[in-house]
Amino acid sequence: MKIIDLLTKEKLSLSFEVFPPKTQSSYDSVKKATEEIAKLKPAFMSVTYGAGGGTSKYTLDIAKNILQEHGVPTLAHLTCVSSTRETVKERICDIKNSNVKNVMALRGDIPSDLQNSNKDSWDYKHAIDLIKEIKEIAPDLCVGGACYPEIHPESANQDEDIKYLKEKVDAGCDFLTTQMFFDNNLLYNFLYKIREAGITVPVMPGIMPITNANQLERAIKLSGSFIPQRFKSLVDKFGTSPEAMKQAGIIYATDQIIDLFANGIKNVHVYSMNKPDVAENILNNLSSILN
């Protein structure tokens, strides 16, 4: 099933993101974790792509397994920043020839060895280049793109960011998923601005349950997310107690999702990080709301 078809339904839904193994030795444990999440029957599951393509060879394998063994629609991530055009075309064809109907088109983080290189030598400089390639090779694939309620780290300002986002959508993005955020008002303001700019495709908020203090530090470093005082206080109080922090983080994420549903959002994507217990707890917290 195409994700765009799921997103146009009136039913409230939750989906989860997982990541592939980094090595063959961890394949079985990662596969088991993703299958445990698939058994919860989310609306769909997305499978990430390693930085610089590092774990890319397992992305489609995990996505196909979830779909074939558990009947859960999947979204395979694809990045392009450090890849040749030949390699990317091959991977697009692999997805096209599988039963996976959805692809998340991302530029990807720039590897350290390319930070100071000449971008003119890259086959792909931006996600829009990848989106156009996918639409040319596999026009029937449903294509997702990323968006940033708090502005892309490389954009000069939000107006520039939204202008580029509109270009991505015009190039063929069927839906958008947001970077993590911890203050829902940032999302609501962002949605107003992009609708004013003529971006009409569905937007799925991305929610990251923070279950330990170190995870929060990494999240801030990666995304630059604003941390509201309410969440800072939570981490200050419970951050040194693993079980308390885990429970508090799950409840905070659940509260965010409930508020999103209450304010007209129908579909929320949870960055569950291969943690079946976290995914299950959030689903249990929302069971009556989702049903």
Residue positions per predicted region:
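Active-site mouth loops of central-metabolism enzymes
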Residues: 13-29, 74-86, 144-160, 237-251
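Short, acidic/polar
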Residues: 24-37, 59, 85-92, 157-167, ...
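N-terminal amphipathic alpha-helix/helix-capping segment at the start of soluble metabolic enzymes
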Residues: 1-16, 23, 133-135, 232-233, ...
